[in-house]
UniProtKB/Swiss-Prot annotation:
GO molecular function (one): sequence-specific double-stranded DNA binding
UniProt record, GO biological process: cell differentiation; muscle organ development; myoblast proliferation; negative regulation of transcription by RNA polymerase II; regulation of DNA-templated transcription; regulation of transcription by RNA polymerase II
CDD domains: homeodomain
The protein, known as: Transcription factor LBX1
Entry function: Transcription factor that controls hypaxial muscle development by down-regulating myod1 and cdkn1b/p27, thereby allowing myoblasts to proliferate before the onset of terminal differentiation.
Amino acid sequence: MTSKDEAKSSASSVEERRRNALDLLPPPANSNKPLTPFSIEDILNKPSVRRSYTICGTAHLLSSADKPPAAGLPLSSRALLSQTSPLCALEELASKTFKGLEVSVLQAAEGRDGMTIFGQRQTPKKRRKSRTAFTNHQIYELEKRFLYQKYLSPADRDQIAQQLGLTNAQVITWFQNRRAKLKRDLEEMKADVESTKKMSPSAVEAVLTISELEESGSERGNSRSRSPQLGLTSNHMPLSPSXPLTDQHASKECSEDEEDVEIDVDD
């Protein structure tokens, strides 16, 4: 029992000492202001947060205007609660942070779009490579080889390129183009044969007669072009130096007499 009484007396003495120490403290200068500066009201009353009251308050007022009014609370009290809410300050800070990120992302996206559009407008067209100008000797040798060999082996390709002073790519390209040209020519010939088969016999005869007339006309034109050349050579034939002048004069007189005789006979 004595130990319990001693413990009670020691606890009461400690409480009395604490009370005496609190009584000795000076009273606060402003009793209305709370002692802790970390209360919600102190945070909301800071000047940095007051600036956001207008934006956040208007946003809350607009959102609250869509909702039905709560029962038992007037409009002024609801507006004050929305302005002094700690969620408003948190929302404002978050909106500022995300707003900066959104602006940077949008600017980057706009810059990319502008660069892509600008690049698409000014992308130069790919210039086609200039075609290789082969010499007559090179074309002759290539055509001669193409007559009996349409496809070249690597060894043959190297041999032709070295022989004609060309590159392997040029030889390959020439043979590819030549095979394509041969294929087109064969297709055109097949189309011509099929079209002639579909034609009537009378149309075929008409085509043949037209071709024969064209050939005969060309032959006549050639003969006419040759005849004046022969007349010019006969008229301008040089006289032999061995022929005397008297013989020439006599021949002229005989020709004149013959012409006169021919005229008389004609009459």
